[in-house]
Amino acid sequence: IMICSRLDHSAKGCILFFVQLLRSMYHLATSNICIIDSYWPAVSMLKHKKSLKVIQIWHSIGKMKKSGYQSLGKKSGRKPEFAGYLKMHKNYDYFIGGAPVWNKYYAEAFNIDESRILNYGLPRIDYLIKTQDSNRAKFFEEFPGLIGKKIVLYAPTFRKKMKSHWHDILRASKYDDIIIIVKNHP
């Protein structure tokens, strides 16, 4: 079962989100394993049966920004009271991480003991490596004028209440042989 839902703050969006929460509560009650890649209220806020194992695989590649408990009370983070009310990132039995060098930062961000972090690598990286050549070929087929140019991808992470600085980066690029591609966070 896969449940994907974002909170749309309209009345209809709130109702649909609530329906997804109820649906996920049913599946949490009837499953033995839950794999999650973000925060989900039904996982963190509810008490679950002992046989349920919750595995957090997170959705980023590595730990390059402060998030979760590391950013509480900061401009880009949640208010501590809000995080406490939502029991932010609670009930994870295991966390799948990349290299052990990131463990300290994952433990801080998710408020978990490092012994719960399993360094199995990140599935997303395997996919990107396996498809690298075909993705490159497709890209240059679509944009043949970029062959031979240096290409820089700027893909800023999402931060609420903070503006992206990609305009400044574009202005700083003074070289004709450098192409900057901006891909904003969804």
Where are these regions (language model features)?
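Conserved catalytic-core segment of nucleotide-activated headgroup transferases in glycan assembly
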Residues: 1, 109, 119-186
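Active-site and donor-binding regions of nucleotide-sugar-utilizing enzymes
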Residues: 1-130
